[in-house]
C-alpha cells in the first residue's frame, strides 16, 4: 500500500477539509491514506485482514479488524469516510453497522469508483444521511451528507443459507459465492478422493463449502481453514457447525498466521482485491505452499484457465499436473518432492 487508489486521489482533492476532523475510515481500504491523511485524529475499521496488517503497522490500535464494528472502534469520531466496495450487500452491512454507532450530526463521506455502483449509496442512505455528489474525478464519485438518524443494525438479519448436496452452507455479505456454489469450486470438489486422511489446509476458505464437502466423504481428515475476510471466517465457522464438522478457522493473509505443515492444501484462490485485479494472493499461495507441506504433500487449486499459474507452479515445485478442466477452469496439482524449492 503505497500508491493511492483513484478513490483516495479524489479525497486528496479535499484534504484541507479534513485537517480539523476526527475521522473514521472504513469500507474497501485499498491503500494507506487513513494513516497518511492530515487530520485531527484518524481511526480505521476493516473486515479485510491484509488491509488491517498494513494499517496497524502505521496506526497501531487505531486500526481495527473485525466483522462488526463496536462503539469503541468509532469513539470520538465526528466524520466517516467510507470507501464503497464492489458488493452492495457488503456496503449495506458495513454502513448500517457504522451509522448505528456514530452520533447524529456526523459528517458522512462516501467515495468509490463509478463501476462499483457507488451511486447507489444515495438511495441506501436516504433515510439516515441524505447524500449529495460533491466531486467527480478519476472515474470516481464523492458524496457528502450528515447523519440525521441512526439505523437499527442487527447482524443476524444479514445471514444467508443454501444447500449443496445435502450440506448446509452459511453465508454473509462479502463472502465469495454467497448465493451458491461457484463452478470452479464444483470442479475442484469433483477431484477430491474419498477416504483421504491427514491434515488439510483450506486457504481462502470463503463460506467453508470445500472443507465440509471434503469432510463428508473423508471424515478422518483434520481441517484448518483461513481467509483474509472476517465475514468468510465467521461464515466458515457457522458452516462447519451446521454440518457437525470440526476444524480450526482463523483470519490469515494467505500463510501469514498459519503454523505447521499439512498433507494437502486446497484453494480456489481469488484474483481480485476489491475492484482491482491482483494475482498476488495466488502467487504467494503457490510459492509459500512448500513451507507448509509435508514431504509428499499436495497443493491442489482451481483457477480460471487463462491465469498464468503453470509457470509459477513449475518454478516452485518443479512440475505440475492438470487433473481436471473445463473451457473456463483448470484444477492444478503439485506434489512436494525434493525438486520443490524450500522457500
Swiss-Prot record:
Catalytic activity, as annotated: guanosine(1207) in 16S rRNA + S-adenosyl-L-methionine = N(2)-methylguanosine(1207) in 16S rRNA + S-adenosyl-L-homocysteine + H(+)
Question: PANTHER family annotated for this entry?
Answer: RIBOSOMAL RNA SMALL SUBUNIT METHYLTRANSFERASE C
An example Pfam family from this entry, by short name, is MTS
NCBIfam families recorded for this chain? PRK09489.1 (NF007023)
Q: What is this protein called?
A: Ribosomal RNA small subunit methyltransferase C
The first-level EC class reads transferase
Q: Which UniProt keywords apply?
A: Cytoplasm, Methyltransferase, rRNA processing, S-adenosyl-L-methionine, Transferase
Q: Which organism is it from?
A: Escherichia coli O139:H28 (strain E24377A / ETEC)
Decide whether keyword Magnesium is in the record. Answer: no
The gene name on file is rsmC
UniProt lists the family membership as follows:
Belongs to the methyltransferase superfamily. RsmC family.
Function, please?
A: Specifically methylates the guanine in position 1207 of 16S rRNA in the 30S particle.
Assembly and partners are described as: Monomer.
The answer, when asked if Nucleotide-binding is one of the entry's keywords, is: no
Q: One GO CC term of this entry?
A: cytoplasm
Subcellular location(s) of the protein: Cytoplasm
Which GO-annotated molecular functions does the record name? Answer: 16S rRNA (guanine(1207)-N(2))-methyltransferase activity; nucleic acid binding
Documented EC number(s):
2.1.1.172
Location, primary (coarse class) = cytoplasm
Amino acid at each position: 500500500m503505497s500508491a493511492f487508489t483513484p478513490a483516495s486521489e479524489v479525497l486528496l482533492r479535499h484534504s484541507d477539509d479534513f485537517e480539523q476532523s476526527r475521522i473514521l475510515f472504513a469500507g474497501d481500504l485499498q491503500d494507506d491514506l487513513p494513516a497518511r491523511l492530515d487530520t485531527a485524529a484518524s481511526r480505521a475499521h476493516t473486515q479485510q485482514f491484509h488491509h488491517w496488517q498494513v494499517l496497524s503497522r502505521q496506526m497501531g490500535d487505531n486500526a481495527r479488524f473485525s466483522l462488526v464494528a463496536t462503539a469503541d472502534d468509532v469513539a470520538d469520531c465526528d466524520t466517516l469516510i467510507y470507501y464503497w466496495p464492489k458488493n452492495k450487500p457488503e456496503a449495506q452491512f458495513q454502513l448500517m453497522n457504522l451509522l448505528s454507532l456514530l452520533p447524529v450530526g456526523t459528517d458522512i463521506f462516501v467515495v468509490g469508483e463509478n463501476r462499483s455502483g457507488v451511486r447507489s449509496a444515495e438511495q441506501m442512505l436516504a433515510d439516515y444521511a441524505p447524500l449529495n455528489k460533491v466531486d467527480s474525478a478519476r472515474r470516481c464519485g464523492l458524496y457528502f451528507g450528515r447523519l440525521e438518524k441512526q439505523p437499527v443494525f442487527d447482524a443476524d438479519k444479514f445471514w444467508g443459507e443454501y444447500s449443496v448436496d445435502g450440506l448446509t452452507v452459511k453465508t454473509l455479505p462479502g463472502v465469495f459465492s454467497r448465493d451458491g456454489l461457484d463452478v470452479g469450486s464444483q470442479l475442484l470438489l469433483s477431484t477430491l478422493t474419498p477416504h483421504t486422511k491427514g491434515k488439510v489446509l483450506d486457504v481462502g476458505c470463503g463460506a467453508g463449502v470445500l472443507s465440509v464437502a471434503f469432510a463428508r466423504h473423508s471424515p478422518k481428515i483434520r481441517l484448518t481453514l483461513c481467509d483474509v475476510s472476517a465475514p468468510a471466517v465467521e461464515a466458515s465457522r457457522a458452516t462447519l457447525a451446521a454440518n457437525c464438522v470440526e476444524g480450526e478457522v482463523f483470519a490469515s493473509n494467505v500463510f501469514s498466521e498459519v503454523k505447521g505443515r499439512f498433507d494437502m492444501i486446497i484453494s480456489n484462490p481469488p484474483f481480485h482485491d476489491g475492484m482491482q485485479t491482483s494475482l498476488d494472493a495466488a502467487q504467494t499461495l503457490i510459492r509459500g505452499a512448500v513451507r507448509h507441506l509435508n514431504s509428499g504433500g499436495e497443493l491442489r487449486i482451481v483457477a480460471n484457465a487463462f491465469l498464468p499459474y503453470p509457470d509459477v507452479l513449475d518454478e516452485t515445485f518443479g512440475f505440475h499436473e492438470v487433473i481436471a478442466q473445463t473451457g473456463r477452469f483448470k484444477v492444478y496439482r503439485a506434489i512436494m518432492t525434493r525438486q520443490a524449492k524450500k522457500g
